[in-house]
Amino acid sequence: MAYPLEKALDVMVSTFHKYSGKEGDKFKLNKSELKELLTRELPSFLGKRTDETAFQKLMSNLDCNKDNEVDFQEYCVFLSCIAMMCNEFFEGFPDKQPRKK
């Protein structure tokens, strides 16, 4: 039986590999692969309209080694940043249900 966090990690890894390597290095996401991943897997993050300038800036910020691709480590940093933003957002809300022990 997989635990929720194990399932989350599996989804994180398998989602990266679902999109990486379609057009090149199988261990990296190029610009179009990253855009497809975000559009299909994180549609709320991009919103209804994709601003090309904003996407270019995101790609540039994620691509720490400036190879014009996002590797798994860069992808993990991105997901970690999103998780931290979500956590900060929800810290301001009172609990509606008691926490499970």
Curated annotation (Swiss-Prot):
N6-acetyllysine sites (modified residues): 7, 35
Modified residues annotated as N-acetylalanine in this record: 2
UniProt-annotated location(s): Secreted; Nucleus; Cytoplasm
Manganese found in the keyword field: no
Molecular function terms, GO-annotated: calcium ion binding; calcium-dependent protein binding; RAGE receptor binding; transition metal ion binding
Domain EF-hand, chain residue ranges per copy: 13-48, 50-85
Pfam families, per the entry: S_100
Binding locations of Ca(2+) 1: 28, 33
A GO CC term attached to the entry: perinuclear region of cytoplasm
Biological process terms in GO annotation: positive regulation of canonical NF-kappaB signal transduction
UniProt-listed CDD domains: S-100
Residues annotated to bind Ca(2+) 2: 63, 65, 67, 69, 74
SUPFAM superfamilies: EF-hand
Subunit organization: Homodimer. Interacts with PPFIBP1 in a calcium-dependent mode. Interacts with PGLYRP1; this complex acts as a chemoattractant that promotes lymphocyte movement. Interacts with MYH9; this interaction increases cell motility. Interacts with Annexin 2/ANXA2. Interacts with TP53; this interaction promotes TP53 degradation. Interacts with CCR5 and CXCR3. Interacts with FCGR3A; this interaction inhibits PKC-dependent phosphorylation of FCGR3A.
Role, per record: Calcium-binding protein that plays a role in various cellular processes including motility, angiogenesis, cell differentiation, apoptosis, and autophagy. Increases cell motility and invasiveness by interacting with non-muscle myosin heavy chain (NMMHC) IIA/MYH9. Mechanistically, promotes filament depolymerization and increases the amount of soluble myosin-IIA, resulting in the formation of stable protrusions facilitating chemotaxis. Also modulates the pro-apoptotic function of TP53 by binding to its C-terminal transactivation domain within the nucleus and reducing its protein levels.
Protein's name in the database: Protein S100-A4
Lineage: Eukaryota, Metazoa, Chordata, Craniata, Vertebrata
Gene that encodes it: S100A4
